[in-house]
Amino acid sequence: MELIVYIIAVFGLAAFVYFVRNKKAHYIAAILFCCVQLTLNYLIIVDRNVFLEYFFKSDALSIIFISILTITGITTIINSFVYFENRKDNYFRRGIYLASLFVLFACMTGVFLSDNINILWILAEATTLCISLLIYHDRNEEALEATWKYFF
């Protein structure tokens, strides 16, 4: 149940930052995403059997990886906002970037918790698509070329 709430929250925040083009809303959504990720991390550390779903299971290694992902994710989001402030990027590109970043972290969390090889493969491919959106968020010719080079 907790994983379903996490997925709904992350995809809801990703849709929010994509459709709402406001600087303050992006900050609030990023803070909420960090809180959701920290809450999931806390639940996994406190109760290892929090996920009783068929396809997902937490073990010691997944706890370590999700903790590292949470720390990396929070620092990435902070660094992204510093980068956007220095660059004076528009809110459309920022929304695409943040939505892709939120979904990327959700997919990586799913990869670490996956107990089924098919789900693992689907989520690993979803991370590839999210990373390609992160590469192409500038929407210029160089970004397009880099995205195609990433795929092939």
For each predicted feature, which ranges?
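Alpha-helical multi-pass transmembrane bundles of energy-transducing inner-membrane proteins
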Residues: 96-103, 107-152
